[in-house]
Amino acid sequence: MAKKVVALIKLQVKAGQANPAPPVGPALGQRGLNIMEFCKAFNAATSKLEPGLPTPVIITAYSDRTFTFITKSTPASVLLKKAAGVSSGSKRPNTDKVGKVTRKQLEEIVKVKEADLTAAELEAAVRTIAGSARSMGLTVEG
């Protein structure tokens, strides 16, 4: 018989830096899950990623106090800010431009995010990420 799902917990945790402090501890603790077990498993799963990049994770909690988790790729906005070398996007993206990204940088971001994107082709995925860049106040070159 399949385990009964008690909760789906969505968090953003820095890659390789999960610890019992908020937001991980309280989110897992109130469901009765083993916090240290999650931290060790998450840090092992994200050891290949660049340390410190926010990584979305979806934790499925079961009635017998066990869990499984799925890590997603880093949000496009974080990757775009890193590529453009800016700390935050523009407050008025249509009038104030805060940085530039090239098509090559967009293609690299698409390669990182390809598992989470629904686009069928590389060109469509690049256009999706370019739209995100423009909505943050970044100029897309190329």
From Swiss-Prot:
PROSITE patterns: RIBOSOMAL_L11. Pfam families: Ribosomal_L11, Ribosomal_L11_N. GO terms for molecular function: large ribosomal subunit rRNA binding; structural constituent of ribosome. One or more lysine residues are methylated. GO terms for cellular component: cytosolic large ribosomal subunit. InterPro entries: Ribosomal_uL11, Ribosomal_uL11_bac-typ, Ribosomal_uL11_C, Ribosomal_uL11_C_sf, Ribosomal_uL11_CS, Ribosomal_uL11_N, Ribosomal_uL11_N_sf. One of its GO terms (biological process) is translation. Keywords: Methylation, Ribonucleoprotein, Ribosomal protein, RNA-binding, rRNA-binding. It comes from the Bacteria. Part of the ribosomal stalk of the 50S ribosomal subunit. Interacts with L10 and the large rRNA to form the base of the stalk. L10 forms an elongated spine to which L12 dimers bind in a sequential fashion forming a multimeric L10(L12)X complex. Belongs to the universal ribosomal protein uL11 family. Forms part of the ribosomal stalk which helps the ribosome interact with GTP-bound translation factors. This is Large ribosomal subunit protein uL11. It comes from Xanthomonas campestris pv. campestris (strain ATCC 33913 / DSM 3586 / NCPPB 528 / LMG 568 / P 25). The lineage of its organism: Bacteria, Pseudomonadati, Pseudomonadota, Gammaproteobacteria, Lysobacterales.
